[in-house]
């Protein structure tokens, strides 16, 4: 595979260093790799271009949202696809994955309180056809990773929230962070 060959010792070291400190200076990174800053920059840019890494701000969710939930959903194929389409851009969701086993879909989300999780479950999941079973596990502490790629972006269109629902739609989550305040 080309990707495996591309991830040589130097590229793995770059990934390791950027994981520890995404703001490391190229001169410092170059010293750790024993290469020139230009060579380090070229390698970082190639890793980004090949979509192996992405450099962005991560957020400590506990500073904003004290609760998190892991939601397991058992649904038919249509129900699973509906939920994926609805939640793909939800700012509260930080992990969404199709699975095999007891659940067809796993959702990890953050919330400010239990009522926000209940609203989310009732409006975004339980209301959809094809949902057979929903299992929720609550957490008040995310241990690893401590920082997450939460998406606090306002919707591009002021009439719609990030998930595609209208701002005035009764089905949207009342505390959606994508609504401009």
Predicted regions and their residues:
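A compositional/biophysical signature of low hydrophobicity enriched in polar/charged and small residues
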Residues: 1-181
